[in-house]
Amino acid sequence: MENNFQVFRLISENFSEVSHSIGLNSDFLEANVLNIMLLLFGLIYVLKQFLGSLLTIRQEKVIFAISECEERLQQANNRLLESEKQLEQTQLVITQVLNDAEITAQKVRQSILDKGKIDVEKLIGASKASIVVAENQINQQIKQKITALAIQKVSSQLKAQVDTTMQAKIIDSSIIKLRGDI
């Protein structure tokens, strides 16, 4: 750090000596001010056309690039508007499809419910018919059973009441009836 201070001190001492030697020279010919001015004006005159044409070309390129960018921007905006319209149309179509799907689902659900009701009614009708058939069969069986029991009872009563003489009389009367029919 001390070295840095020494360096700054040396520079400041030398600067004060140099500043006495810098000054404005009032002799134009000796200072070459005239030559420098002529050279500067000559360069400006010569380079004006060259640089002007370069700058004009550059300006035309920049203007062309800007107009091309503006044209592309306009095309992009047009495509954006078209895409937004297509998006709106697509959303409308999607909404319509969803509505149609919902209506179709409701119709299918209702038709399934209606078919289920019809099937249940058919099952109820078939059940009632089978119950009626079963009742008829049971009634028929009961009648047959009652008839069989009645015949059995009458038969057992007849066996108990009918003896051999009575059997002979019944057989004889049956034979007589058969002769009369013949």
UniProtKB/Swiss-Prot annotation:
It is a single-pass membrane protein. Keywords: ATP synthesis, ATP-binding, CF(0), Chloroplast, Hydrogen ion transport, Ion transport, Membrane, Nucleotide-binding, Plastid, Thylakoid, Transmembrane, Transmembrane helix, Transport. It is found in: Plastid, Chloroplast thylakoid membrane. It holds the Pfam family ATP-synt_B. GO terms for molecular function: ATP binding; proton-transporting ATP synthase activity, rotational mechanism. GO terms for cellular component: chloroplast thylakoid membrane; proton-transporting ATP synthase complex. F-type ATPases have 2 components, F(1) - the catalytic core - and F(0) - the membrane proton channel. F(1) has five subunits: alpha(3), beta(3), gamma(1), delta(1), epsilon(1). F(0) has four main subunits: a(1), b(1), b'(1) and c(10-14). The alpha and beta chains form an alternating ring which encloses part of the gamma chain. F(1) is attached to F(0) by a central stalk formed by the gamma and epsilon chains, while a peripheral stalk is formed by the delta, b and b' chains. In plastids the F-type ATPase is also known as CF(1)CF(0). This is ATP synthase subunit b, chloroplastic. The gene is atpF.
